[in-house]
């Protein structure tokens, strides 16, 4: 998919989408900070951009209103719901994003019901050579969190970054990033601290690195992370490494995850440039 443009006014965005539908071109709207217009068939990109230029000259032209009447969407196509916060959560997160969030919450509840150690025996990185073929352990450590702040912080970033990746690049891409970063960040962390660790932060740092570099090198991907946030991520790594806050942090997982995300973004953007 290709992002064509963004509109601050959702009604204007809907008018353009409706008009293009009457011309046989299917566009979709994704609501984020603005109304982003996406085109599935990239072979029609030049035609859409030419129509967009004409539309921007006079968006109030009667033919655009007529197109909205024809499609039955003169109300901008938006639904004003009683729970906008929940709607925002749902709109930004795809099935993989939600599945991981639910898994983390369920595991957190289990840890509070039966105790951290009991759950860690089930899900932790292999802590005995006899467990090395229990392959789920190389990934399930990401679901364990040890405080309310720990899980809230990680899930907020996971929803913000993972949801964007899934919505823009697909569930498959998010799965690949998650699996690779969980495996490699876990491997590095167990070298630092042993097998008794947990949390989604290694994957979150991979997503930070991926989204930031992908946005810098491939703006057309539609994902980005403000430079101030990537600087915050780096400062947080430094703070954890120097133990400024007296908190136990998975520093190895953070660094490994960030490197994994940057490397994957570099490879993906390199391949994208070769194709063009």
Curated annotation (Swiss-Prot):
| Enzyme Commission (EC) number | 3.4.21.105
The record's listing under InterPro entries reads:
GlpG_N_sf, Peptidase_S54_GlpG_N, Peptidase_S54_rhomboid_dom, Rhomboid-like_sf, Rhomboid_protease_GlpG
Which cysteine residues pair off into disulfide bonds? none
Q: Which residues form the active site?
A: 201 (nucleophile), 254
Q: Which UniProt keywords apply?
A: Cell inner membrane, Cell membrane, Hydrolase, Membrane, Protease, Serine protease, Transmembrane, Transmembrane helix
Single GO biological process annotation from the record: proteolysis
One Gene Ontology cellular component term attached to this UniProt record is: plasma membrane
**Catalyses which reaction(s):** Cleaves type-1 transmembrane domains using a catalytic dyad composed of serine and histidine that are contributed by different transmembrane domains
Molecular function GO terms recorded: serine-type endopeptidase activity
EC main class here is hydrolase
Query: What is the purpose of this protein?
Result: Rhomboid-type serine protease that catalyzes intramembrane proteolysis.
- Protein name, please? Rhomboid protease GlpG
Which species is listed as the source? Salmonella arizonae (strain ATCC BAA-731 / CDC346-86 / RSK2980)
Which gene is this protein's source?
A: glpG
């Amino acid at each position: 998919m290709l992002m064509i443009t963004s509109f601050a006014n959702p009604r204007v965005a809907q008018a353009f989408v409706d008009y293009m539908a009457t011309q046989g071109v299917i566009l979709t709207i994704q609501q984020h900070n603005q109304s982003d217009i996406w085109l599935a068939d990239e072979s029609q990109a030049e035609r859409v951009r030419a129509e967009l230029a004409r539309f921007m000259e006079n968006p109030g032209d009667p033919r655009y209103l007529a197109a909205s009447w024809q499609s039955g969407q003169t109300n901008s196509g938006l639904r004003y719901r009683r729970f906008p916060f929940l709607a925002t959560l749902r709109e930004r997160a795809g099935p993989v994003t939600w599945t991981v969030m639910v898994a983390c919450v369920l595991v957190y509840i289990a840890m509070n019901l039966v105790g951290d150690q009991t759950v860690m025996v089930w899900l932790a990185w292999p802590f005995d050579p006899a467990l090395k073929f229990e392959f789920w352990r190389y990934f399930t450590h990401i679901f364990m969190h040890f405080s309310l702040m720990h899980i809230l912080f990680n899930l907020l970033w996971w929803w913000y970054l993972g949801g964007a990746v899934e919505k823009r690049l697909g569930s498959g891409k998010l799965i690949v990033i998650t699996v690779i970063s969980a495996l490699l960040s876990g491997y590095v962390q167990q070298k630092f601290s042993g097998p008794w660790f947990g949390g989604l932060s290694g994957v979150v740092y991979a997503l930070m690195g991926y989204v930031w570099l992908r946005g810098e090198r491939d703006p057309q991907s539609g994902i980005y992370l403000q430079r101030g946030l990537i600087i915050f991520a780096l400062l947080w790594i430094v703070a954890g490494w120097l133990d400024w806050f007296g908190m136990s942090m998975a520093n190895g997982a953070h660094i490994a995850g960030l490197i994994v995300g940057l490397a994957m973004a570099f490879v993906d953007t390199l391949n994208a440039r070769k194709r063009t």
